[in-house]
């Protein structure tokens, strides 16, 4: 009888310890999820910034990587990548370097094509067109004979100019992950075609699928902030061996090189 009571007491204590441990883990995971969301919110709060020249007066996260007196450089990058059945993968996008020290901006419009040759080796070719920004307008700095391409560059709008994120907490049922060894972190959400940002992308790009995308937010570096780390977001419409359709955007603040 006494032995039975001791056994029940021991089992009770074991179950209690497991329950407390599980609650502690859940609380720790919930705290980490909140920290990851807060980290992404700092970047998402920049959307929209319709006038890119506003970045001259925007301060970003600073650490010991910045030299004294360096105001830093914003790196803004938007590109669309499309690969459909039987066709090569092509990405078209623009990257800008917004120098807060000189209040000047330069960059490149980049067209990249990837494919596999008959032996299965990956091949690629890339063409860069240098640009500058003045009065919130993109201006090619070298002559472009192709009128259609020149107009595409001059009319280019970055996602930060029209994208709008009220709050990442508005997105439900997200898959949030954290790898402390890298460190890296991410959050993935299934969107609908009625989502404001999805509508904006479809308005500006000929996206050859009606499938609603997933939103993937990715980052690496210290969650508390790091100029070495990098953050970007992707709208993934299709991702498999035969087809890939996704839009990538990033805004990062770095020491001026």
From Swiss-Prot:
**Which residues are covalently lipidated (S-diacylglycerol cysteine)?**
23
Its Gene Ontology cellular component terms are: plasma membrane
Keyword Acyltransferase on entry: no
Q: Residue positions of N-palmitoyl cysteine lipidation?
A: 23
The protein's UniProt keywords, in alphabetical order, are: Cell membrane, Lipoprotein, Membrane, Palmitate, Signal
- Organism domain of life: Bacteria
Question: Where would you say this protein principally sits, based on its record?
Answer: membrane
Localization recorded for this chain is: Cell membrane
* InterPro entries linked to this entry: Csa, Csa_sf
Is Transit peptide one of the keywords UniProt gives this record? no
Q: How does it sit in the membrane?
A: Lipid-anchor
From the UniProt annotation, give the residues forming the signal peptide: 1-22
Q: Which family does it belong to?
A: Belongs to the staphylococcal tandem lipoprotein family.
Please identify the protein, giving its name as recorded. Answer: Uncharacterized lipoprotein SA2275
State the organism of origin: Staphylococcus aureus (strain N315)
Its lineage opens with:
Bacteria, Bacillati, Bacillota, Bacilli, Bacillales
């Amino acid at each position: 009888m006494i032995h039975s009571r001791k056994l029940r007491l021991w089992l009770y204590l074991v179950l209690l310890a497991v329950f407390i441990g599980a609650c502690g883990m859940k609380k720790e995971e919930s705290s980490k999820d909140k920290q990851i969301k807060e980290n992404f919110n700092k970047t998402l709060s920049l959307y929209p910034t319709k006038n890119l020249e506003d970045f001259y007066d925007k301060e970003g996260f600073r650490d010991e990587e910045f030299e004294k007196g360096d105001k830093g450089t914003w790196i803004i990058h938007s590109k669309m990548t499309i690969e459909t059945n039987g066709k090569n993968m092509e990405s078209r996008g623009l990257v800008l370097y917004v120098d807060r020290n000189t209040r000047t901006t330069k960059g490149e419009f980049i067209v990249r094509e990837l494919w596999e040759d008959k032996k299965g080796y990956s091949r690629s070719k890339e063409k860069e067109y240098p640009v500058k920004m003045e009065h919130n307008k993109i201006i090619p700095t070298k002559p472009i004979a192709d009128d259609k391409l020149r107009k595409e560059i001059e009319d280019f709008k970055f996602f930060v100019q029209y994208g709008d994120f009220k709050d990442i907490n508005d997105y439900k049922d997200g898959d949030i992950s954290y790898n402390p060894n890298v460190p890296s972190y991410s959050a993935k959400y299934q969107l609908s075609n009625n989502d404001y940002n999805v509508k904006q992308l479809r308005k500006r790009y000929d996206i050859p699928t009606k499938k609603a995308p997933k939103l993937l937010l990715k980052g690496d570096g210290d969650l508390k902030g790091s100029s070495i780390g990098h953050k970007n977001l992707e709208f993934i419409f299709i991702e498999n061996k035969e087809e890939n359709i996704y839009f990538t955007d990033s805004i990062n603040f770095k020491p001026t090189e």
